[in-house]
Curated annotation (Swiss-Prot):
Taxonomic lineage from the root: Eukaryota, Fungi, Dikarya, Ascomycota, Pezizomycotina
Organism: Gibberella zeae (strain ATCC MYA-4620 / CBS 123657 / FGSC 9075 / NRRL 31084 / PH-1) (Wheat head blight fungus)
Residue intervals of the DBINO domain: 809-934
Record-linked Pfam families: DBINO, Helicase_C, SNF2-rel_dom
Gene: INO80
Biased composition (Basic residues): 29-44, 446-455, 695-709, 1826-1835, 1880-1893
Motif segment (DEAQ box): 1180-1183
Binding site for ATP: 1070-1077
UniProt protein name: Chromatin-remodeling ATPase INO80
Record domain Helicase ATP-binding: where: 1057-1229
Length: 1904
């Protein structure tokens, strides 16, 4: 104890943050007491704080928080109150802190992903932050009577607002004081200054509640002034006499003086209690008030003496130090008090007693623990120097250091972020204050404490600069006049206030009275009651908190469990797949092996049969040769029989082979793309012998197979049918069918039946014996006769064979016929018995008829008569029906014969009619050709160096003079022409007349159009010129064109102008890249310049080329005003205003000249386009209207336009029907809808494929002559001299092992023969299956990963994972913390964790662990340095250390340090002994060992220094043989053979305590250990080098060794190998080598694909190879396409352009690329041709090379062959090639299914299929089956077309509508498509599913 009566606690262990089980208790907390001195405090701002102040603030932020109390939840304790209590020390004003206050703070090291466990918040503390500005959130005010922690910020404003609050109950007994937030600023108690000469004016009165501006907060919202935040409120009267909340009373300012004898340390009931305020105390002030001046002399200024004993409030205050930057006001927590300031005579408030002196101490600051009686006062010392800190024991200091959290490598104390934020509560019931002596039994009403503000005030920091003077103000503001609002200065501080002398005197008197009356209180009684009340309140508050937190925990648990269940459900699915995957794979493999075995058996069986057939044929030939050479007739007959037998056997074998090889039974059907997929088996073909080759039953009869009929039975049936037909024709009656005789069986008794059966058996046996004897006798006689006739040398053979055959026949009869005969006999017996029974019944009726002569007989007679009449009527009806059927059959036969004759006559007529139509068209073309001279224009610019095409034949033009006389009338009615008997001259004259009329009509139409424009010109609407009469003129390049046209382009312009002059439409079919766009623009420029025709012109183009057209027109003819007609509906509505003006004159000043739009918008806005009269309509990429059935074709045909121009580089894409549609579009009057002409044009040329004949030369010439005038086509090699030919190379690739496995698996799952047979029959149901199969095979050829991608594999993670932060929201740098947590958590209560629950952790409640640690590890440990030093002399225990080169301190550290610390220290040691072995390597020094290392034998012989001499070269390999051998073995680079099935983070303790979080972070993220394992970072090493730090000061090098496995590393996550991804595909491997070569040579590549999924995979490959690329496919937006093409054209660093063949092959210019690669080819050659011409076009200066990757021996070879055939058709038709064009392999459209099926077969199978098909065709069965199939309507599968399969998810590039539009042509007669579109019941306009043929036609581009 010191002289003031304080118990010294310097040696007591202070509680620390991190101590387990250490719930902060007042009795166990160390306290240092300082003398209170007078200091002048000056206000400082944050920026002006001294270093010591800041350090003090940080160091004392959590001085009272224990390690386990970081989550301070409750201060309730059931332990008995301690008799001893030490008051807390006060920190010095300068911010000096004590060592025992340097406790650890909470570390909020929780990542974004892993929020920490929320601790139970203290109901009496507020959430706080470490910043001195403001709190995290408003905190819950402490309940009445409970201490509240200070403000979150380190300002006194928050302290006073909370501590000086009225209405709080008195401080009661408690086991532990209220906890303080670890981040609260230190509560320092400052002795006030000694200046007493300054007068303080009284403060101005304030309203009860008023908001004020707080400059320290970041909000503009005014805060409410709490009653506790009033000026002058002190700890003494903070809670005294609390008025009702919200109605505070005004206070009277006062000043007082006091002598030293008033500080007698008596307790409450001791009778000598004095004021607890020391003489040197300043009165604490509100943060709203200014610093008060010192009172004048004579006032109650406290003398400069220390009190003998601190007041109970001081002793029971918190240990938190005051922030040195505060106002100097006391931050001691408020305690309940019933004292109130004196007031003028008025009724006392309800919260005070009725004693004479309301300031008595009967209810002031009771403690929860009754303190002992204070001792007598010691002499008062006026001023005493500050007590210095006492040094704590070493153990305590070490424990404190251990309790700190390792934030970085050096542990630093940081302010703790308290995440526990409370909501303020209004406590409904509070303990009543104890009555005074006069009114002990009068209960005081309970009052609710006022709400407190939790925000800090920066004004406190500012007020520190003003001198302070302690003043005490009563909580009761009972001034007679209300206080006015305080005036504020400019900086937000209130103006200073002064006290009146009268008020100070009143206060002095009142306080003296209080001190005198305080001795009569009974402390024991008072404390007991208050203690119980507070305990009861704590229990109530805790129960409420438990309920609240229970709800939150339940919600959190429900969410957690739901997530677990979802996760386990997903994992269960994965486990199921993993468990049964191997089983399924094993089963599939077994089936595959079985199927392969069966297929091999079938092949062996086939080879054996073929060999047997060959041997049999050889035997036949030999037998025939012997028969010819035989002289004897018998021998010759024998040889002939042998030959016949051999021939029959060969025929049977041949039939078996023709039926096909029966494949193995398959239970697994392939279905790789979804949808239903049939399986075709050869068994179906065999079952088809019963009638239908398809093997399908016709009716719903027996489910089993039909009985097979022999060939003889079939022939007999056929003969009988022919005989019956002949009899019918001759009028004879057919013979009646033989009926089985009815045998009546009479029922007998059992005895008779038994007798009869015995007789029957005997007779039957006898009969059989007789029959057998007769037969054998006859047969013997016959055999004998035959044997006699046969030569002797052949008798022995014939008899034996005959007997065998005879026996075989009888065996067959016994096996087959006996059972049937028995069944027939049984049936006949049953029928016989039934008839006999009926006969008996009838006989009995007849016998009794005389007895039944009544009315009933009459009725029966009538019924029988009616029945007889009905039977007769039925008989005659049947008879008449049969006669009628016979008559109809005869009439039908006659009609059929007449139809055949009529068909023959009609065929001849149609032939002449077709000839007439062709002649008419030829004449028209001849007349037009002479005017337009297309042939001259086409070849006038040919390169003379290029030889004439070898296939080009001389066209023999028609030598016909153009008639000059009057034009004969047009023959429109073909019925007037006699095609049967009319002369050829008359037909020719009619054809010439029609041709002339067609020309005249075209010209008249143009003149009418122009004249109409002239007529309308008068009204000011249109202004068209009439250039028709200008004739043939040679024109020059228009000056409006800002470019120089080439010669061939100028010729093309002349041709187009001549077409326009004649009013004829045309097709500009120049090869792609020759400038069709420029030529069409030049025509419009010519019309504008020469004839002042400025439009309107309409350009319709695909959506991808709209921007290109707009740019080209603006570039070449800037004077044209372009209307870009695209966009949304609202945008187009605005654009249409340009042509909706009725009085628009299309001159140069017109609103627009050229309208550019797309095909889709033309169809959607057809009504608006048809209103306009277009001068010229240009259709770019005219193959978009190649189908005359499409809606766009008919919509464009109905537009009002003078001329039409079609631009296409590929006029023929798939068949001639497309070219017919284009010609019909440009000349509807000539190429009209005559079916004969269309059929000849489209089908007759291709029909030769059925018979594999060659095209007729005359027909080809006539076809070319028809096309010549209307179509102008030039090719690049003829007109473009500087553009060389493109080089096309086919690169054949082989299937890899994985691809072969996939391919063979697919082949084994299907039966090619069945597919072909069903496809030949035209079964639509199987067309989807065929297309699906084609897609699967093409996927295999491209890459097997298209079926199944190799995914990233990892063990099953038994852990929780937090959500990953969004890189889009957070940026590139995202803080990713440790968030993995095990699914298994060890729940541990907080009390067990902290309060001695862990016995191995030392703490206040676990003294055993502390005693063990101190005793065993320190006192009784022999490894202490002192003991080692004492035992090192002589031969004592540790004398060996001097030979082991170990000091006592090193030995102590080795036994007391952790393993990682020792390992790091060993790593830092320099191996001096090993290097000595290197230095002293001579023989004489080999055994040299220093004296201090005699026992270190192993380090002396260490070879590691030798191995570490060098790290490279041969010497390094010699010194590290084992490591080099391991590296060369490649074991570290192999794929891991296995991986763990599951992984999980360590199981952790789950405790609602910050201490557990600290320990976890200490274990998992220990900064020193991480630094030791991983070493310095790259940035640190750079800094060390730049700073030139000495090597001995460098940190420890990395201790973590490199992983043994290079690929695996330290993780179990396996990433798929990209190298394997490349080598799994033969195509990709070839492409990899090719791209490497092209890149090195500086080429740029266009890479085309058919499948968008393959483009996705190719992007991964290009990223892997670091090739720069860009991509364009059907899903690319319109605006992005333009930018992508521009980037590739302008940025040479882009190496590859990935394109979809359909999307990237139209209308874009990519001339910067010189290499084109087709990863997979299209079966339409024009699509590929368009794609490669993106680079091979005008502007290309390099040699263009085209590579085509084809997989050898697969379906791709056959698709390529088919494309080449189509290419040849185009060349022949368009260029007029020679007549030797072989169309072998071509198929009619209806046989396209068969072509696709043939692609799936190999060469051997294809040959067999051809042979089988030929046999079926010869036998006529094929036609029968096709007729049967045609009679059935089958519902088409709604499956996707091949085109859609290729480009799934890509979208339609040209945005065209593909709906079938009803009629094919505008003819009057309805076509089948028309009738189909209407459907039944008038369902017009409904969407009908396309048939498989239509889908195939779409895939080939034949229709839309």
């Amino acid at each position: 104890m010191d002289q003031n009566g304080y118990n010294s606690s310097a040696l007591q262990r202070p509680p620390r943050r991190g101590d387990e089980g250490c719930e902060e208790d007042r009795d166990s907390r160390p306290h240092h007491h300082h003398r209170h001195h007078h200091h002048h405090h000056h206000h400082r701002r944050d920026g002006d704080l001294p270093a010591g102040a800041v350090a003090g603030e940080a160091a004392t932020a959590s001085s009272n928080a224990g390690g386990a109390n970081a989550h301070q939840h409750s201060t309730f304790s059931l332990r008995s109150p301690k008799p001893e209590y030490r008051p807390p020390p006060f920190s010095s004003p300068n911010g000096h802190n004590h060592s025992h206050h340097n406790t650890s703070t909470s570390s909020a090291n929780h990542s974004l992903q892993s929020p920490p466990r929320p601790a139970l918040p203290n109901p009496y503390m507020s959430s706080s932050t470490g910043a001195p500005g403001g709190p995290v959130a408003p905190a819950l005010p402490p309940p009445v009577g409970i201490n509240s922690s200070s403000s979150p910020g380190s300002s006194a404003a928050g302290l006073h607002q909370r501590h000086h609050q009225p209405g709080a109950p008195a401080h009661q007994h408690r086991a532990a004081p209220p906890p303080v937030s670890p981040l609260h600023p230190p509560v320092a108690y400052y002795p006030p200054g000694t200046n007493t000469d300054i007068y303080i004016p009284p403060p101005e009165p304030k309203p009860a509640s008023r908001g004020f501006y707080d400059p320290t907060t970041d909000t503009t919202k005014e805060r409410r002034i709490s009653d506790a935040a009033t000026p002058g409120a002190s700890w003494h009267n903070a809670n005294a006499n609390a008025p009702p909340a919200g109605t505070p009373k005004t206070r009277d300012p006062y000043s007082y003086s006091q002598t030293a004898d008033q500080h007698t340390p008596s307790y409450y009931n001791g009778g000598s209690y004095t004021s607890p305020r020391g003489p040197s105390y300043n009165r604490p002030r509100s943060p709203l008030s200014h610093s008060h001046q010192n009172p004048p002399a004579g006032s109650l200024s406290p003398p400069g003496q220390q009190p003998l004993l601190a007041s109970p409030s001081v002793r029971h205050g918190t240990t938190a130090n005051m922030n040195p930057t505060t106002n100097g006001a006391s931050a001691i927590p408020p305690f309940k008090s019933d004292l109130a300031a004196p007031s003028p005579p008025k009724p006392a408030p309800s919260s005070t007693t009725s004693r004479a002196n309301p300031m008595s101490f009967d209810s002031i600051l009771s403690s929860s623990e009754p303190a002992p009686k204070p001792k007598e006062p010691s002499p008062i010392i006026a001023r005493e120097p500050e007590i210095k800190e006492e040094r704590e024991p070493r153990r305590d200091r070490e424990s404190k250091r251990d309790s700190r959290e390792p934030k970085q490598t050096k542990r630093s104390l940081e302010p703790e972020l308290d995440h526990d934020t409370e909501v303020e509560k209004d406590v409904e019931t509070e303990p009543e204050p104890l009555p005074s002596r006069e009114k002990e039994k009068e209960p005081a009403p309970k009052k609710r404490g006022a709400r407190k503000s939790t925000k800090g005030r920066a004004s406190d920091i500012r007020d520190a600069a003003t001198p302070k003077n302690g003043r005490r103000l009563s909580v009761k503001k009972e001034s007679p006049t209300p206080r006015l609002p305080a005036k504020r200065q400019a900086n937000g501080q209130p103006k200073p206030k002064t006290w009146s002398a009268e008020m100070e005197k009143k206060i002095q008197n009142a306080e003296s009275d209080i001190e005198n009356r305080a001795a009569n209180l009974d402390a024991d009684e008072f404390d007991e009651q208050q203690y119980k009340e507070r305990a009861q309140k704590r229990r109530r508050v805790m129960s409420e908190l438990d309920v609240e937190y229970g709800l939150s925990r339940r919600d959190a648990l429900a969410n957690t469990i739901s997530k677990k269940l979802v996760l386990h459900a997903e994992l269960g699915k994965r486990r199921y797949d993993d468990v049964f995957y191997d089983e399924a794979l094993h089963e599939v493999r077994e089936q595959e092996v079985y199927a392969e075995k069966e297929r091999k058996k079938d092949m062996q069986r086939k080879r054996r049969r073929e060999k047997s057939m060959a041997v049999t044929m050889e035997q036949k030939e030999a037998a025939l040769a012997r028969a010819e050479a035989a002289e004897d007739e018998t021998e010759r007959q024998k040889h002939l029989r042998d030959a016949e037998r051999a021939s029959k056997k060969a025929q049977q074998t041949k039939l078996i082979l023709q039926k096909g090889i029966k494949g193995p039974a398959r239970n697994l059907e392939i279905n790789l793309e979804g949808g239903t997929m049939s399986s075709f088996q050869a068994s179906d073909v065999e079952s088809g012998e019963a009638g239908t080759p398809s093997g399908k039953r016709k009716g719903k009869g027996r489910s089993g197979p039909r009985l097979k009929k022999s060939k003889e039975q079939k022939q007999a049936e056929k003969d009988s049918a022919e005989a019956a037909q002949a009899a019918l024709d001759a009028g004879e009656e057919l013979p009646t069918k033989e009926e089985n005789r009815v045998r009546i069986k009479i029922k007998k008794t059992k005895k008779d039946v038994a007798v009869d059966s015995e007789k029957d058996k005997d007779e039957a046996e006898k009969t059989e014996e007789e029959v057998v004897e007769k037969k054998t006798k006859k047969s013997k006689d016959k055999d004998k006769e035959k044997v006699d006739d046969i030569p002797d040398n052949e008798k022995r053979f014939m008899s034996k064979g005959y007997n065998q055959i005879y026996d075989q026949i009888w065996r067959d009869m016994a096996r087959k016929d006996v059972n049937k005969t028995f069944k027939l006999a049984v049936d006949s017996y049953a029928t016989k018995a039934s008839n006999l029974k009926k006969t008996a019944i009838l006989a009995s009726k007849e016998a009794k008829r005389w007895q039944l002569r009544t009315n009933k007989g009459t009725k029966d007679l009538q019924a029988r008569a009616k029945r007889v009449m009905r039977d007769m009527m039925g008989f005659w009806k049947r008879n008449e029906r049969e006669e009628r059927d016979l008559r109809k059959a005869a009439e039908k036969q006659e009609i059929e014969n007449a139809r055949k004759e009529e068909a023959d006559r009609e065929a001849a007529r149609q032939k002449r009619k077709l000839n007439f139509l062709i002649s008419q068209t030829e004449l028209y073309s001849h007349f037009i050709g002479k005017k337009i001279k297309t042939d001259e224009v086409e070849r006038s610019t040919d390169n003379p160096e290029i030889a004439k095409d070898a296939h080009q034949t001389d066209q023999k033009m028609l030598d016909i003079d153009e008639p000059t006389g009057p034009v004969i009338g047009k023959v429109t009615n073909f019925e007037n022409l006699d095609f049967e008997e009319g002369s050829d001259e008359a037909l020719r004259a009619a054809a010439m007349a029609n041709a002339q009329n067609a020309i005249a009509e075209a010209q008249k139409k143009a003149r009418d159009f122009n004249n109409q424009g002239l007529d309308m010109d008068d009204e000011g609407e249109m202004n068209f010129q009439n250039p028709t009469g200008l004739g043939d003129v040679e024109i020059e390049q228009p000056k409006l064109i800002n470019a120089q046209l080439k010669e061939y382009q100028l010729k093309g312009l002349n041709w187009l102008v001549n077409l326009y002059e004649q009013g004829i439409n045309g097709i500009l079919a120049d090869e792609m890249g020759l400038g069709k766009t420029v030529q069409s623009i030049s025509v419009m420029a010519y019309l504008a310049e020469k004839h002042d025709i400025w439009g309107p012109f309409l350009v319709v183009a695909p959506a991808s080329t709209l921007h290109n057209w707009q740019q080209e027109i603006a570039k070449f003819v800037p004077e044209f005003k372009i209307l870009p007609y695209w966009g949304g509906a609202s945008d187009r509505k605005v654009l249409r205003k340009f042509w909706d003006r009725k009085h628009t004159t299309y001159r140069k000043d017109a609103p627009f000249h050229v309208c550019v739009t797309s095909y889709q918008l033309v169809v959607s806005d057809v009504a608006y386009f048809q209103k306009m009269r277009w001068q010229y309509m240009i259709l770019d990429e005219a193959q978009a209207i190649k189908s005359s059935q499409s809606s766009r074709w008919k919509a464009l045909l109905n537009f009002h336009c003078r001329n039409r121009l079609l631009l296409t580089g590929t006029p023929i894409q798939n068949n001639m029907q497309e070219l017919w549609a284009l010609l019909h579009f440009i000349m509807p009057s000539l190429f009209d809808s005559h079916d004969e002409f269309s059929e000849w044009f489209s089908k007759d040329i291709e029909s030769h494929a059925q018979s594999n004949t060659k095209l007729n030369e005359d027909q080809l010439k006539r076809l070319h002559m028809i096309l010549k005038p209307f179509m102008l086509r030039r090719v690049k090699k003829h007109v473009q001299k500087e553009l060389g030919d493109k080089i096309e190379l086919d690169i054949f690739c082989d299937l890899t092992y994985r691809q072969r496995a996939y391919y063979s698996n697919l082949r084994n799952q299907i039966n090619i023969m069945d597919l072909v047979e069903k496809a030949t029959m035209g079964d639509d149901q199987d067309s989807g299956t065929l297309m699906n199969l084609v897609m699967q095979f093409r996927k295999v050829c491209n890459h097997p990963d298209l079926f199944e991608r190799a995914e990233v594999n990892s063990p099953f993670a038994c852990a929780y994972f937090a959500e990953t932060a969004s890189f889009v929201r957070e940026g590139n740098d995202v803080a990713v913390g440790y968030s993995s947590r095990n699914l298994i958590e060890y729940e541990l209560p907080r009390l067990v964790w902290r309060d001695g629950g862990r016995v191995h952790k030392a703490g206040p409640d676990s003294q055993v662990a502390g005693w063990k640690n101190r005793t065993l590890n320190h006192l009784m440990n022999i490894w202490s340095p002192d003991n080692i030093r004492d035992s090192s002399d002589g031969s004592k225990a540790f004398s060996w250390l001097r030979f082991a080169d170990t000091s006592p301190n090193e030995a102590y550290q080795a036994t007391h340090q952790s393993l990682i610390a020792r390992a790091a220290k060993e790593l830092q040691k320099r191996d001096r002994l090993g290097y000595m072995n290197v230095a002293y390597s001579d023989t004489e020094d080999a055994n040299f060992t220093p004296a201090h290392a005699l026992f270190q034998i192993r380090p002396r012989q260490n070879r590691k220094p030798l191995a570490d001499i060098t790290n490279e070269g041969i010497l390094s390999r010699l010194m590290n043989v084992a490591q080099g051998d391991y590296d060369e073995s490649g074991l570290g680079r192999l794929e891991p053979a296995g991986r763990p099935r599951a992984s999980a983070p360590p199981i952790q303790v789950s405790c609602r305590s910050w201490a557990s979080e600290f320990e976890r972070s200490e274990v998992l993220f220990n900064a020193p250990i991480r630094k030791i394992l991983y070493g310095p970072t790259v940035f640190e090493e750079k800094a060390l080098v730049e700073k030139k730090l000495p090597m001995e000061l460098w940190p420890t090098r990395q201790m973590l060794p490199k992983p043994d496995h290079e690929k695996k590393g330290f993780t179990n996550i396996s990433i798929p190998s990209m190298q394997r991804f490349v080598t799994d595909s033969g195509k990709l491997a070839k492409l990899d080598d090719l791209l490497f070569k092209l890149k090195s040579e500086g080429h740029r590549v266009l890479l085309y694909f058919q499948m968008t999924r393959m483009i996705d995979m190719m992007e991964e490959y290009l990223t892997y190879r670091n090739y720069k690329y860009c991509r364009l496919d059907g899903s690319t937006k319109l605006e992005d396409r333009r930018d992508t093409v521009h980037d590739f054209q302008t940025r040479p660093e882009i190496f590859i352009f990935l394109l979809s063949t359909r999307a990237g092959g139209l209308g874009i210019n990519l001339t910067t690329a010189d290499t084109v690669i087709f990863y997979d080819s299209d079966w339409n050659p024009t699509i590929d041709s368009q794609a490669m011409d993106r680079a091979h076009r005008l502007g290309q200066t390099k040699q263009v090379t085209v590579y085509r990757l084809i997989t050898r021996g697969t379906i791709e070879e056959r698709i390529r062959k088919r494309a080449m055939q189509k290419e040849e058709v185009q060349r022949v038709v368009i260029q007029g090639g020679g007549a030797s064009v072989d169309f072998s392999g071509r198929r009619a459209p209806e046989n396209r299914n068969r072509d696709i099926a043939m692609w799936l077969a190999d060469d051997e199978q294809a040959e067999m299929i051809e042979r089988r098909e030929k046999e079926l065709l010869e036998s006529g069965e094929l036609e029968k089956q096709q007729k049967k199939k045609g009679g059935k309507r089958r519902k088409a599968e709604n499956s996707a077309s091949l085109d859609e399969m290729y480009h799934e998810g890509e979208g339609n590039f040209d945005d065209g509508s593909k709906g079938v539009s009803g009629t094919a042509t505008p003819a009057t007669a309805a076509t089948p498509a028309d009738s189909d579109s209407k459907g039944k019941k008038g369902r017009k306009g409904t969407k009908r599913a396309k048939t498989a043929k239509q889908r195939l036609a779409i895939a080939d581009g034949m229709m839309e």
